[in-house]
Structures are given as C-alpha cells and as structure tokens.
Amino acid sequence: MGLTKKAAYAVGMIRKHGLRGLAIKVMETKYEPIDHEYTKNWQNYMVTKEEWKVQRNTLFEHMPLVSVVVPLYETPECFLRELIEGMLGQSYENWELCLADGSPTDKIERFLAENYKEDARIRYRRLLENGGISENTNEAVAMAMGEYIGLLDHDDVLAANALYEVVRMLNAHPDAQVIYSDEDKIDAESGIHSRPHFKTDYNPELLMHYNYICHFLVVKKTMLEKVGDFNPCYDGAQDYELVLRLTEQTDAIYHIRKILYHWRIHSCLLYTSPSPRD
C-alpha cells in the first residue's frame, strides 16, 4: 500500500472509529489481534480508589519486605518515571526498589538524584560495565534485603495493588516459594491496554511447552539463593530457565488470578506476547 493510500485509509479509520480505533488497528497490524472487550473495559480489572485506600490501611499478620529488582540499560526517562511512580503508588508500602544500571552514561543516575533521592526505598547501583540482562539482574538481586524478590523489567509497570496481592497470598499460603500473577500489555505509543493473559494455576506439563508464568514473578529469597543466579547463557530466555530450575526444587507455586503486571510493547522488544517462543 502506497503512502497516499495509507494516509487515506488512516483518515477513513479516524472518521469511522476515531483516533482510538486507528491506534487499535495499528496495534493489531504490528502485533496480534486485540481483545476489544478487554481494551474497552480494562480498568474494571484494576483496583478502585476505594479498594486501594482499604488496602493501604490493611495490617497483615506477616508484612515482609518485598524487594523489586530491575536491571537498567539506557532506560528511557519516561518509562523509568512511570515504573517508579507505579512503585510509589503501591497500596502495600513495605518494599524496596533495587535498580542495577549497566548504562554507559550517567543519565539515569542524574535523573534519579534529581527526582527521587528523598525516598530511601529506591536504591540505585551504577555497574562498572554492562553484563547483559542476566548479570545485571543478578546485581540487582545482590542489592536486595527483602524476604521476597519480585522481578520487573525496566520498561514495564506494576498495577497499584500488585504487592498487596502478593503479600495477601503469602499470608494465605505461608509455604509459598514462588508466586505469579496474570498480566496484560500496554502500548508505548497509545497507552492502550490489551492482550490480557489470564493464566492457569501451576501446571508443570504446560510449563514444559512454554513459559506461561512470565510476569509478575515473585520468589522467596532463600529459594532463589538455593537455585542460583540467572544464567547469562540463556539471555533472552533467562526467566524461563530460572522458573524451570525453581520447579525442580519446589511445588509450592501459587497463582494470583489478577492482572498485576503491565508489559509495555514497543519497537525495541524482541518478543511481545507469551507464546512457545518466550
């Protein structure tokens, strides 16, 4: 389709469906079909302001420190700001954010110093060199002081009730070694939420076919220490390889049936949806 025809098609889509309709069509063309019902009503799956307030005032019997670890590398400021604001907006407050930065410049360091130096929960380490996704994640894990480790990619965002729901699950199942949640996608350009991944409960057979667990993944720190670091030989599939090692050590793996993780899709992503290739 030539440029003129593309422009005419876009104008027609805007007239018929508006800018939102055009954005959805572009996303479908770039990635995969959209679940229009979810895209239209995604906020119904999120915590309300009233629920958030109740959660903020909830006292659990066990209120562990949760360390959310993030490997950074030339992370766009807009993505990092949204990630951090998502952490600051958590209804559960006993957390720390461990940022391990393998960037060749000090741009991120300066950004954090200018905007977030007052919050001691946000911890930053500038790495001497970029070791890749696995090594940088290992550095972030090494910073962690929490009882549980949550894995967050540098361009993604947690739902406001993510850590609350994790801690609620931990209180309901004190034996839990691994916890994971449902997730959706958020388009970097339009901000549209789409492609929810409503997962099955722990299913070892399905996990042999592909990494359906994916995000949001939380692991007890002692269990993570037992299975060992992320293996850089599996960069690109390091989460999957870690999960498989975890399943060799425990079956105390619990699923939170709520969307707690927003996976940002943009042109720099290698993969954009959970599938056998993830």
Predicted regions and their residues:
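Short, acidic, metal-binding catalytic loop of nucleotide-sugar glycosyltransferases
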Residues: E85-N94
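Short aromatic/hydrophobic "clamp" motif used to bind/position activated sugar donors
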Residues: I149
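Conserved small/polar residues in nucleotide/adenosyl-binding loops
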Residues: Y271-D278
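A conserved acidic beta->alpha catalytic loop
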Residues: D101-R110, E129, D153
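Conserved donor NDP-sugar-binding/catalytic core segment of glycosyltransferases
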Residues: N161-I192
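Catalytic donor-sugar/metal-binding loop of nucleotide-sugar-dependent glycosyltransferases
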Residues: R245-H262
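Glycine-rich, basic loop-to-helix element that forms the pyrophosphate-binding segment
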Residues: L127-A144
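N-proximal low-complexity "stem/linker" segments adjacent to membrane-targeting elements
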Residues: A23-E85
